[in-house]
From Swiss-Prot:
One of its GO terms (molecular function) is zinc ion binding. The gene is accD. It catalyses: N(6)-carboxybiotinyl-L-lysyl-[protein] + acetyl-CoA = N(6)-biotinyl-L-lysyl-[protein] + malonyl-CoA. The keyword ATP-binding applies. Keywords: ATP-binding, Cytoplasm, Fatty acid biosynthesis, Fatty acid metabolism, Lipid biosynthesis, Lipid metabolism, Metal-binding, Nucleotide-binding, Transferase, Zinc, Zinc-finger. Residues 34-288 form the CoA carboxyltransferase N-terminal domain. Acetyl-CoA carboxylase is a heterohexamer composed of biotin carboxyl carrier protein (AccB), biotin carboxylase (AccC) and two subunits each of ACCase subunit alpha (AccA) and ACCase subunit beta (AccD). Signal peptide: none annotated. The lineage of its organism: Bacteria, Bacillati, Bacillota, Bacilli, Lactobacillales. Its cofactor is Zn(2+). Its main location: cytoplasm. NCBIfam families: accD. InterPro entries: AcCoA_carboxyl_beta, Acetyl_CoA_COase_Trfase_b_su, ClpP/crotonase-like_dom_sf, COA_CT_N. This is Acetyl-coenzyme A carboxylase carboxyl transferase subunit beta. Binds 1 zinc ion per subunit.
Length: 288
């Protein structure tokens, strides 16, 4: 009877594996790094349109850049002399997988640690320079980061140099426990000695600058300038809201909010930072 006859097979909508493989061979692949999505305006941007400064052409958002990219944008070509590359962590807590994580970060960034330190010329002005890189374990501050920055200040005192630091950090490095927290006091003491010597210290806040770095040397500069829209704070927004039981302003912990309340002296476009650094260092008795 027709009523109980076998139904025809359903039409296949999804191609089987053989069809998939034949189709995929004929479709050109788009390279992974050809486009970037802006975290602010959500637009897809052709990488070449970002330019060397990595700024969104639609909303002017400043993408996070590596220490090497920052260096190329800032210093006179060929003038940078890297220092303190021989310092290594002793891994005092023998934290599980810490050494593997360090090795992975070194391979990914080309850096030995989360901060690049040395001396350089910026438009002819000689200075001691530190650049933190958030791509290296979120530029967390451990014993090596603290020691390198402390030695940079000590060298600057001996050679009568101004210090310029580009800050970026997720805070203290948990894998080193109390030793990482101690770096806050150690670096702050070095900043004070540099200040007592009558030398200029400029901090440039970049996205993100949080935790122990914010609570110490990031906010201790003689002048504090920042890149637009950078996130700067100590504790996270949700932690603060839970503690105070209040809703915070939408722009809370953005540098524009901090400038409005007197915590930041100026907000400077990334493309203008080189000129601003040279001007401020020269104005405060820089060394050429």
């Amino acid at each position: 009877m027709a009523l109980f006859s076998k139904k025809d097979k359903y039409i296949r909508i999804t191609p089987n594996n053989s069809l998939k493989s034949s189709v995929s061979r004929n479709v050109p692949e788009v390279p992974d790094e050809l486009f970037a999505k802006c975290p602010a305006c959500k637009h897809m941007i052709y990488q070449k349109d970002l330019g060397p400064a990595k700024i969104c052409p639609t909303c002017s958002y400043n993408f996070r850049i590596s220490a090497q990219e920052r260096l190329a944008l800032t210093v006179d070509e060929g003038s940078f002399q890297e220092l303190f590359t021989d310092i290594e962590t002793k891994d005092p807590l023998r934290f599980p997988d810490y050494q593997a994580k360090l090795q992975k970060a070194r391979q990914a960034t080309g850096l030995h640690e989360a901060v690049l330190t040395g001396t350089a010329l910026v438009k002819g002005q000689r200075l001691a320079l530190a650049i933190m890189d958030s791509h290296f374990i979120m530029a967390s501050m451990g014993t090596v980061v603290g020691e390198k920055i402390t030695r940079l200040f000590e060298l600057a005192i001996n050679e009568r140099l101004p210090v310029v630091i580009f800050t970026a950090s997720g805070g203290a490095r948990m894998q080193e426990g109390i030793m990482s927290l101690m770096q806050m006091a150690k670096v702050s003491a070095a900043v004070k000695r540099h200040s007592n010597a009558g030398l200029f210290y400029l901090t440039i806040l970049t996205d993100p600058t949080t935790g122990g770095v914010t609570a110490s040397f990031a906010m201790e500069g003689d002048m504090i300038i920042a890149e637009p829209q950078s996130l700067v704070g100590f504790a996270g927004r949700r932690v603060i809201e839970t503690t105070v039981r209040e809703n915070l302003p939408d722009d809370f912990q953005k540098v524009e909010f901090l400038k409005e309340h007197g915590f930041v002296d100026a907000i400077v476009k990334r493309t203008d930072l080189r000129d601003k650094i040279a001007h401020l260092v020269a104005f405060h008795g820089g060394v050429s």
